[in-house]
Amino acid sequence: MGQKINPTGFRVGVIRDWDAKWYAEKDFATFLHEDLKIRKYINTKLADASVSTIEIERAANRVNVSIHTAKPGMVIGKGGSEVENLRKALNNLTGKKVHINIVEIKKPDLDAHLVGEGIARQLEARVAFRRAQRQAMQRTMRAGAKGIKTQVAGRLNGADMSRIETHAQGTVPLHTLRADIDYSWDEAMTTYGKLGVKTWIYRGEVLPAKANNNTKGGK
């Protein structure tokens, strides 16, 4: 069943942290819907800015949003104009004070969402799916990945019956919890319908941080 579980959720609390860092009792549903609105707005507004992860933190009446992107210049804009417009829009959307932090992705070829999104955009441009997968895997391996697996599902090449094509290079140890595996699921809108693109990238092992236990002799 290790092939079925979401690799990101499987590693939360071991080597991964939550993308939403807040706690609420009575307002949980309200905050959750607010998070979904924020993520949907950012992903729509910055569709061409290679945005990967969006982290949301909350403190009192303040919302801190960290946007991980491969194109920080496009998000920030000339003199910070674009990010300021985005901040104002999120302020109006949530009715709270929003602070935006831009985090640059140094190696976009090691980010599963950006790689999967690249494959999806190629499929929409009618590039052969095997070629799109092969080129993406080669770029990722050259960038320093230990392994990559890509899966494309749907009416490939407009076939009447949908099928799944999986290609892999290197190793992708899904059962090893200390393995840093980035996972993403993306969609390609083609003339024959939607194609699903799944991407797993193994970036090496991460040793979980051990808790410091300084107690001695029953103290």
Swiss-Prot record:
What are its GO biological-process terms?
A: translation
| Superkingdom in the source lineage | Bacteria
As for what it does, the entry says: Binds the lower part of the 30S subunit head. Binds mRNA in the 70S ribosome, positioning it for translation.
InterPro entries tied to this protein: KH_dom, KH_dom-like_a/b, KH_dom_type_2, KH_sf_prok-type, Ribosomal_S3_C_sf, Ribosomal_uS3_bac-typ, Ribosomal_uS3_C, Ribosomal_uS3_CS
One GO cellular component from the entry? cytosolic small ribosomal subunit
Entry's family note: Belongs to the universal ribosomal protein uS3 family.
Protein name, per record: Small ribosomal subunit protein uS3
Q: Which cysteines does the record link by disulfide bonds?
A: none
Keywords, alphabetical: Ribonucleoprotein, Ribosomal protein, RNA-binding, rRNA-binding
State one molecular function term (GO). Answer: mRNA binding
Q: Cite the KH type-2 domain residue spans from the record.
A: 38-106
Subunit structure of this entry?
A: Part of the 30S ribosomal subunit. Forms a tight complex with proteins S10 and S14.
